């Protein structure tokens, strides 16, 4: 375990070769004497693990949730409704022109080591994230970021982006520029209401938080401490909430809901974006034909999957976005169970005798869906062999060769970064590894058409923007290079008699920014 007994920024002036060196240095200097907030210890049991602790390009469910508490962006998203609010920013961006904005930092903003947050830190954080493979697509609208002075940051954009600006700026979390990217992965330090005191994100590990005594922003810590246990096993998490050794449990297994409620906990389901999807190798026949791809979605009895495997806690797909999202539009092609339609499409595509396919299934919760999917596909003339394993994503990068798979079943949920349609579509359909490798869809005219529509929507607003997004949703429902089977409801359990102000969110992660111990 990496013990992060955090001290002054001077500790990080030189890069340490190992976590052990840093831990020893920290131990020698002693802990910062953080001022404590009133009110005991918030406890939680998390469902995901990670050993990458850096906020740069952070995409793990565990550490993204942790960064919401330890770091700040210029603006932050309220994950309960995806509204934005100023965090490190003193207020709204100052519009210089359609493609230039200035942001002033909050007076007195400090990191948990007591040092000031300055504009150079913001510039450094944005530049590192703009160069990051994960976040670069989210930030492609930015041409340059510069420090006007210690308190003011200037953003020059490549094109107008006003309607989405604040939510997208919230993706980047700010940290001291004097700390190297490598050291941020060992001893991360931020300006948020909480600071790490110990950090071990392995399965079976834990994260301890203490209040940042220097925090002067809108969401101060409301407890003396916070402790997260990491338990990927659903039974272990269930035991913790039932024994009341944890106030909050992430990712409740449907089979355990009754027992958890019987032990006195509240279980709350939230409609969200989380989804299992089919992804096709579109450079490989017959999956280069959209009629074949469409046949899969008619062949699968999704409602039966929802009823039998998901215990009813999912919603059929009517579009790329779920109906609960503000920008929902019912797509031109809504798939319902129709095996005869599937057979007809295969016949139209020249495969009247059916096709043989290997379905590569990720070995996580979607594996429970695979047997019924296999049976449904077989019945529609799509003769399916299952291969269930941990996906080796390194094999699925951009290549001149045909990638080594036919069709994949795996889950995803980029709504932890935001809920605007451009961000969500950019994740899977943008100019990145999902389309240059993986689905290999970026060689098609339809992909180019989608990029043009998305770019027009970025520069638009209001009804015009929504209409352009609607065209995108329609196109995706027709082409289905990668498309959801259903949108999943996420279940969180909590002890309402022990924690106040906690509200579950509809994506991975836990938020305690307004929660306190009763």
Question: Model segments located where?
Answer:
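Long beta-strand-rich cores associated with HINT superfamily self-processing modules
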Residues: 492-518
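Surface-exposed binding/hinge segments that line
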Residues: 94, 104, 137-178
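Structural transition elements
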Residues: 315-348, 363-368
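Extracytoplasmic/peripheral linker and loop segments enriched in polar/acidic and small residues
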Residues: 383-395, 423-496
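N-terminal lobe/hinge region of extracytoplasmic solute-binding protein
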Residues: 45-96, 127, 189
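Alpha-helical secondary-structure segments
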Residues: 43, 118-125, 150-156, 193, ...
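Ligand-site clamp/hinge motif
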Residues: 214-259, 383
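Gly/Pro-rich hinge or "lid" segments in bacterial periplasmic/extracellular proteins
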Residues: 78-83, 168-221, 225-227, 235, ...
């Amino acid at each position: 375990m990496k013990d992060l007994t955090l001290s002054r920024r001077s500790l990080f002036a030189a890069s340490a070769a190992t976590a052990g060196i840093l831990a020893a240095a920290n131990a020698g200097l002693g802990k910062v004497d953080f001022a404590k907030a009133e009110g005991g210890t918030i406890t939680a049991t998390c469902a995901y693990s990670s050993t990458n602790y850096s906020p740069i390009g952070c995409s793990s469910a565990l550490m993204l949730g942790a960064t919401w508490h330890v770091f700040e962006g210029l603006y932050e998203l309220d994950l309960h409704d995806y509204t934005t609010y100023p965090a490190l920013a003193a207020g709204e961006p100052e519009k210089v022109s359609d493609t230039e904005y200035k942001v002033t930092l909050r007076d007195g903003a400090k990191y948990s080591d007591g040092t000031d947050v300055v504009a150079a830190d913001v510039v450094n954080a944005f530049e590192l994230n703009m160069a990051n493979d994960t976040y670069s697509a989210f930030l492609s609208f930015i041409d340059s970021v510069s420090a006007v002075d210690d308190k003011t940051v200037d953003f020059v954009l490549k094109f107008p982006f006003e309607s989405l600006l604040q939510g997208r700026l919230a993706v980047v979390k700010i940290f001291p520029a004097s700390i190297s990217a490598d050291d941020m992965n060992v001893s991360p330090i931020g300006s948020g209401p909480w600071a790490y005191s110990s950090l071990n994100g392995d399965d079976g590990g834990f994260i301890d938080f203490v209040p940042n005594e220097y925090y002067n922003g809108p969401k101060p810590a409301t407890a003396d401490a916070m402790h997260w246990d990491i338990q990927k096993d659903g039974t272990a998490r269930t035991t913790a909430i039932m024994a009341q050794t944890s106030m909050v449990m992430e990712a409740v297994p449907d089979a355990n809901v009754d027992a958890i409620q019987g032990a006195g906990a509240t279980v709350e389901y939230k409609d969200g974006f989380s989804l299992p999807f089919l992804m096709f190798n579109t450079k490989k026949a017959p999956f280069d034909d959209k009629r074949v791809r469409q046949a899969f979605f008619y062949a699968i009895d999704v409602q039966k999957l929802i009823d039998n495997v998901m215990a009813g806690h999912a919603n059929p797909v009517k579009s790329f976005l779920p109906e609960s999202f503000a920008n929902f539009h019912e797509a031109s092609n809504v798939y319902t169970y129709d095996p005869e339609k599937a057979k007809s499409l295969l016949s139209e595509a020249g495969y009247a005798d059916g096709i043989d396919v290997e379905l590569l299934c990720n070995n996580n919760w979607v594996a429970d869906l695979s047997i019924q999917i296999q049976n449904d596909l077989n019945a529609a003339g799509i003769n399916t062999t299952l291969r269930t394993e941990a996906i080796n994503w390194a094999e699925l990068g951009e290549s001149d060769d045909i990638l080594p798979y036919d069709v994949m079943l795996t889950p995803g949920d980029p709504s932890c970064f935001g809920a605007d349609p451009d961000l969500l579509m950019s994740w899977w359909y943008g100019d990145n590894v999902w389309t240059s490798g993986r689905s290999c869809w970026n060689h098609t005219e339809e992909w180019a058409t989608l990029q043009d529509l998305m770019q027009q929507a970025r520069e638009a607003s209001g009804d015009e923007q929504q209409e352009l997004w609607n065209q995108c949703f329609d196109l995706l429902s027709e082409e289905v290079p990668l498309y959801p089977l259903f949108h999943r409801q996420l279940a969180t359990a909590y002890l309402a008699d022990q924690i106040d102000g906690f509200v579950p969110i509809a994506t991975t992660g836990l938020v305690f920014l307004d929660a306190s111990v009763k």
